[in-house]
Amino acid sequence: MKIIITLLLPIIFFQFAWSQKLTITQIKTNLENAPNPVAYARDVLKKQYKIDTIIVLNSTHFSGLADSLAYHGKVKKVYGPYQNKMLVQVLAKLPNTFTRISQVFIDTSIFTRRIADSLANSIVTRIQTGAASFEDMAQTYSMGGEGATKGDLGWVARGAIIPQMDKEIAKRKKGEVFKIWTKAGVHIIKKTSDAKQDTGFALILRVMI
């Protein structure tokens, strides 16, 4: 047993020393080429790592680095380092259903329900008759911050919004404008595009360097 340990020690020491001398570029290349990147980070690099599942809620507007990489990143590709201490590798991706929608939101904490409903009906009528564009109505009336994008919420993932809105949007045709009531107020929704499949989830490996 002592002989085996004695023989293994130089190998372990060499492997550790070798991993310590690798440049960032070499580490990234080795991770990308490794059959099992997790095992490589754990057993060869001897680095702390974490595996996360990232959900892409919107493929147009991203909340930060994680969902942006999850959507735009290529599988097996290693990105970074970030903050001089972390590499990020996209291990796998899975699809979800996305629909592009626009919104004019009337807040019932500001208006009574009766006034909000009357205003919403007026807005919908003006849009449907061509008296005003959805974009103009969003810039003028929306209280949810959509004025800056003329009402456009981007490509929204199924499950990213409340279930009743998800169900109603799924039933509607492209171009339809309709109202949905929630506890927050009334949402005037335009289904800008039909649903499509796109990257909705990604498995991410973070390696501390």
List where the protein language model places each region:
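Short acidic-hydrophobic surface loop/beta-edge motif
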Residues: 75-84, 177-183
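A cross-kingdom feature marking charged/low-complexity
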Residues: 167-193
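Start-of-domain marker
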Residues: 20-74
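Bacterial Sec-dependent N-terminal signal peptides
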Residues: 1-25
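Loop/turn elements at helix/coil->beta-strand transitions in domains of secreted/extracellular proteins
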Residues: 130-134
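A cross-family detector of function-defining hotspots
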Residues: 57-79, 152, 158-161, 170
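Well-structured core secondary-structure elements of compact alpha/beta domains
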Residues: 20-31, 51-59, 85-129, 143-166, ...
